[in-house]
Design a protein with these regions (language model features):
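Conserved S-adenosyl-L-methionine
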Residues: 179-298, 315, 319-321
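Non-catalytic nucleic-acid substrate-recognition regions in nucleic-acid-modifying enzymes
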Residues: 2-141
Length: 380
């Protein structure tokens, strides 16, 4: 890929998964990948950018940088947006659009106000050209714009995602405290599970960790079958896009004999939610869900990997109820899982202490705004 053909872009990532996100971007063909806070910047060809939309598991969004300009206030922003692109080509009045803004600049400290200035610049220019303007659509716009303000610089990007990439489409049923799919995929990547040994979730909830693990092992691209905003770009290359779609489809391992993937869930209603999600993902023959407490079941022949996102006790009075769960989990692991690895997402160090085990690794991540640690235990 010649440097002149490279596009500048940013992947928006879950907090704590920046390094894992950079690794994934590089493996899929991105260049000059550099971690940022909750993001990574990179260079890519158009083919690579299409590939990332289809195959990357960790990003929330992928933003293609289109223009940058000095911005020291409202007037600079208004004028800069009007000059940023050939809007006659990119935004016809028949198209809807939305604007998202992050960061701040002099006199532009509120994202809603800054977005309003971008909107005004665009619709004023449309009226000058066509005598009519586009409508705003916050749910399913034809063109999604992203503006980042960094002190005295504005960067305008196109959001090719068409909705957050963490929404895979299989999640028909939500758990009480749902784990986002891209965070789940990142946690599985950090665990090092590669599909060669059993994987068990003793508190599986709606099954997201197991589903994302199975999809990774089968190399099933998360973006296949969904619509993307980039398909409405003025320079969209349909043949190149189809090539990348076919490439993603061909990667899927259809006859792979995976070791056992097992989820255990005490609440029968939640266990049924997991089965619904697994069926929606087409993984009924890959993942087994068992009802009841993990103390009532035996692990498959190992060694293998245990992954777990138990409750954190966020509500008043819950901690006392959960003390027994963590204590029982620690006993279960020590009794049954000799030689296994345990990875547990902890949002409450006090409760995790009830395991009576010492973690060998503590990786900071954020789950739904809760400061968490992805803890690793080597069971002896």
């Amino acid at each position: 890929m010649g440097r002149e053909n490279r596009l500048s872009a940013v992947a928006v990532l879950p907090q704590g998964l920046e390094a894992a996100g950079c690794d994934e971007l590089s493996k899929l063909g991105a260049h000059e990948v550099r971690p940022l806070r909750r993001a990574a910047e990179f260079q890519a060809s158009m083919a690579c950018l299409y590939r990332l939309h289809l195959q990357a598991r960790l990003p929330f969004r992928l933003l293609r940088e289109m223009a940058s300009f000095p911005c020291q206030g409202r007037d600079d922003l208004y004028d800069g947006i009007r000059r940023a692109l050939n809007w006659e080509r990119w935004l016809h009045p028949s198209m809807s659009f939305r604007v998202d803004v992050t960061g701040s600049a002099p006199g532009l400290n509120h994202s809603h106000y800054s977005a309003l200035q971008v909107k005004n610049a665009l619709v004023d220019q449309q009226r000058d050209i066509w005598g009519q303007r586009s409508s705003i659509d916050l749910e399913a716009p034809d063109l999604s714009l992203h503006l980042h303000l960094n002190r005295e610089t504005a960067v305008l990007s196109l959001d090719g995602s068409g909705g957050s990439l963490h929404r895979r489409g299989y999640r028909a049923a939500m758990g009480v405290a749902p784990l986002k799919e891209n965070l789940a995929a990142g946690l599985i990547q950090l665990s090092g599970w590669d599909g060669s040994v059993p994987l068990v979730d003793p508190c599986c909830g709606s099954g997201i960790l197991l589903i994302e693990a199975a999809l990774m092992a089968l190399q099933q691209a998360p973006g296949l079958g969904r619509n993307f905003g980039l398909e409405g770009w003025a320079d969209f290359q349909s043949e190149l896009w189809q090539e990348e779609c076919e490439r993603a489809q061909q990667r899927r391992r259809r006859n792979l004999n995976l070791p056992p993937l097992l989820g255990i869930e005490q609440d029968p209603l939640v266990a049924e939610q997991a089965r619904v999600n697994i069926a929606a993902a087409g993984l009924e023959e890959v993942i087994e869900i068992r009802d009841g407490s993990f103390t009532e079941h035996h692990l498959p022949e190992g060694p293998g990997v245990l992954v777990c996102n138990p409750p954190y006790g966020q509500r008043i009075g819950e901690e006392e109820e959960l003390d027994h769960l963590y204590s029982a989990l620690g006993g279960f692991v020590r009794e049954q899982a000799s030689g296994w690895q345990l990875w547990l997402l902890s949002g409450n160090p006090k409760l995790t202490g009830g395991l009576r085990m010492k973690a060998s690794r503590r990786i900071p991540v954020s789950n739904g705004g809760i400061d968490c640690r992805w803890l690793h235990y080597a069971i002896r």
